[in-house]
């Protein structure tokens, strides 16, 4: 009985060490990235640059929008300059994974799968699934099931594509 209790305590202690090691590694990685950003003097920010009002090219050809302003303020808070890196959505997370960018400031849906790999800020916008149909076609599509057999356009690799594949059979 004492041996079993001792074994459980050892197991719990080992689990605590493993959990703390995970936290320490994550904290170390974040501190390491922050040090790299400060040494470099720039925060490399991935954003699409094609999505008004969040990030887009203004009349002067420069990136502008809410996410651009947010990126500049974040960099200023860190004592560095923002290096804006317009990136197509289908390559955004790969750019983060390969360390071509330091942070993504872009409309990114938080999913359980993504939370396993990435840290997320508090959401600054909330969006849902919407549909747009041609004038005169309003009555033909009222529910997701009405999309069956129809051609539907969604962004490649977006949560909308995932939702469509999971919720509508036979969509093209």
Language-model features, listed with the residues they occupy:
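Short, well-ordered beta-strand segments
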Residues: 44-48, 132, 151-154
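Ligand-binding "clamshell"
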Residues: 112-123, 169-172
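Bacterial N-terminal signal peptides that target proteins for export
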Residues: 1-14
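C-terminal segment of classical bacterial N-terminal signal peptides
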Residues: 17-28
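Extracytoplasmic small-molecule ligand-binding "clamshell" domains
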Residues: 30-107
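Flexible hinge/capping segments at coil-to-helix
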Residues: 134-151
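Solvent-exposed loop/turn segments at secondary-structure junctions
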Residues: 50-53, 89-91, 109-113, 137-139, ...
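Secondary-structure junction motif
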Residues: 153-168
């Amino acid at each position: 009985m004492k041996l079993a209790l001792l074994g459980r305590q050892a197991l719990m202690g080992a689990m605590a060490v493993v959990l703390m090691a995970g936290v320490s590694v994550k904290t170390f990685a974040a501190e390491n990235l922050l040090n790299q950003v400060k040494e470099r003097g720039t925060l490399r920010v991935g954003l699409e640059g094609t999505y008004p009002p969040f990030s887009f090219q203004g009349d002067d050809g420069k990136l502008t929008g809410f996410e651009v302003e947010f990126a500049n303020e974040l960099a200023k808070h860190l004592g560095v300059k923002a290096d804006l890196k317009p990136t197509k959505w289908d390559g955004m997370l790969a750019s983060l994974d390969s360390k071509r960018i330091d942070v993504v400031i872009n409309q990114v849906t938080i999913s359980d799968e993504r939370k396993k790999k990435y840290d997320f800020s508090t959401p600054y916008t909330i969006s849902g699934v919407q549909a747009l149909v041609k004038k005169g076609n309003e009555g033909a599509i009222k529910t997701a099931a009405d999309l069956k057999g129809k051609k539907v356009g969604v962004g490649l690799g977006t949560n909308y594509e995932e939702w469509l594949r999971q919720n509508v059979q036979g969509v093209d």
